[in-house]
Amino acid sequence: MHRALLNASRRVATVRSMASTVEGDAFRLSEYSSKYLGHRKAAFTEKLEIVNADDTPALPIYRVTNAVGDVIDKSQDPNFDEQTSLKMYKTMTQLNIMDRILYDSQRQGRISFYMTSFGEEGNHVGSAAALEPQDLIYGQYREAGVLLWRGYTMENFMNQCYGNADDLGKGRQMPMHFGTKERNFVTISSPLTTQLPQAVGSAYAFKQQKDNNRIAVVYFGDGAASEGDAHAAFNFAATLKCPIIFFCRNNGYAISTPTSEQYGGDGIAGKGPAYGLHTIRVDGNDLLAVYNATKEARRVALTNRPVLIEAMTYRLGHHSTSDDSTAYRSSDEVQTWGDKDHPITRFKKYITERGWWNEEKEMEWQKEVKKRVLTEFAAAEKRKKAHYHDLFEDVYDELPLRLRRQRDELDAHVAEYKEHYPMLETLQSKP
């Protein structure tokens, strides 16, 4: 009798222990999920296994067309009308022609600096077309096509590259550092990656203001993704659930550093899920795919779920006019990419097969754009430069005494030594 009671007591204790264990495990898993894992479900395991990064499958590359421009799955074709399609093509080719002329002009010493977008025209136009005018854009320095799509004029481009008095930035920035409040494009700054956390801040402000049909979009390259500010921005956006799209142009090189020396994981997109970002990798030379991906990303971002897009592309040009890429890559590599996978060539086939484009129209358009670029270039070259008084303006509503004194001292200096300042004749009249 005593032994039976003892065994029964042990069984009850065992059941209670098991119940307590189950309850304890459930408690811990619930706590881990809500407090540590972003509400993701996890389970305990008794199998010791370290995740092998080399065995983790890479994220797929979304595409609509193949390398020669054929639509693979008709259901993925956004079916643009003729007007929209031609605007897309003309924006890409206009950018390409402008790049060629301004690059050559820098080599002639007529402007001080330039950066081309050769080979990346598709991700500019495809993404810009999927956004809304009210969306706030933070660019890096290779997004001229986004501005073209938004209506930034050829005159604006030329004035900025010359830094003349009609430049929207009053000549205070080096070439390629565009910005326009009217087009919701924040002025570009030179320090790498600073725009990412700034863009997240803007997106957070939209969320706080309950601006329900506006997002922030920030463009950056693979090199910028290696900077600490990128990781801070990813975490900031995911934690605060901001309406933002991170658009990474992975073009293979951070100036001279190839991507193989920048990261050991699954590219830039591979970082997204780890930070809690909704993520897609897209063929950046496929305008249709970039458009679809960006449009869907915008829909998701509007629900306060940040999205990372990695656009796989290739930089056909040098990093800038200060770079000679033949020092770190072969001309054969560049030629092969240009011949086998160019976004303009791919989309040209798309519109040609629909009867919207032909070689005669191509020749007429090329001639028209070259004339327009050269005309605006010549006009910008002749315009006066901003007066040096502008150095003191646009910070304070009313110029403080110390700045007025500095301005007056500069006036006195220039008046005394004006023979040493021949450029005074090229300046706009004193305000």
Curated annotation (Swiss-Prot):
Tell me what reaction this enzyme catalyses. Answer: N(6)-[(R)-lipoyl]-L-lysyl-[protein] + 3-methyl-2-oxobutanoate + H(+) = N(6)-[(R)-S(8)-2-methylpropanoyldihydrolipoyl]-L-lysyl-[protein] + CO2
**Positions annotated to bind thiamine diphosphate:** 140-142
**Gene3D superfamilies given in the database record:** 3.40.50.970
Among InterPro entries, the record links this protein to:
Alpha-ketoacid_DH_E1_comp (IPR050771), DH_E1 (IPR001017), THDP-binding (IPR029061)
SUPFAM superfamilies, per database record: Thiamin diphosphate-binding fold (THDP-binding)
Q: Which GO terms describe its biological process?
A: branched-chain amino acid catabolic process; fatty acid biosynthetic process
Which pathway? Lipid metabolism; fatty acid biosynthesis
Q: Does the keyword Transit peptide apply?
A: yes
A cellular component term from Gene Ontology for this protein is: mitochondrial matrix
CC cofactor: thiamine diphosphate
EC annotation from Swiss-Prot or TrEMBL: 1.2.4.4
- Indicate which residues the UniProt annotation says bind K(+): 189, 194-195
Q: Which CDD domains match?
A: TPP_E1_PDC_ADC_BCADC
Q: Which UniProt keywords apply?
A: Fatty acid biosynthesis, Fatty acid metabolism, Lipid biosynthesis, Lipid metabolism, Metal-binding, Mitochondrion, Oxidoreductase, Phosphoprotein, Potassium, Transit peptide
Pfam families to which the protein is assigned, alphabetical:
E1_dh
- Tell me a Gene Ontology molecular-function term this record carries: metal ion binding
The EC category is oxidoreductase
Coarse class of the protein's main subcellular location: mitochondrion
Q: Where in the cell is it found?
A: Mitochondrion matrix
Protein origin, superkingdom? Eukaryota
The family line of this record is: Belongs to the BCKDHA family.
Chain's role? The branched-chain alpha-keto dehydrogenase complex catalyzes the overall conversion of alpha-keto acids to acyl-CoA and CO(2). It contains multiple copies of three enzymatic components: branched-chain alpha-keto acid decarboxylase (E1), lipoamide acyltransferase (E2) and lipoamide dehydrogenase (E3). Required for the production of the monomethyl branched-chain fatty acids (mmBCFAs) isopentadecanoate (C15iso) and isoheptadecanoate (C17iso).
> What is this protein's name?
2-oxoisovalerate dehydrogenase subunit alpha, mitochondrial
**Species of provenance:** Caenorhabditis elegans
Q: What gene does the UniProt entry assign to this protein?
A: bckd-1A
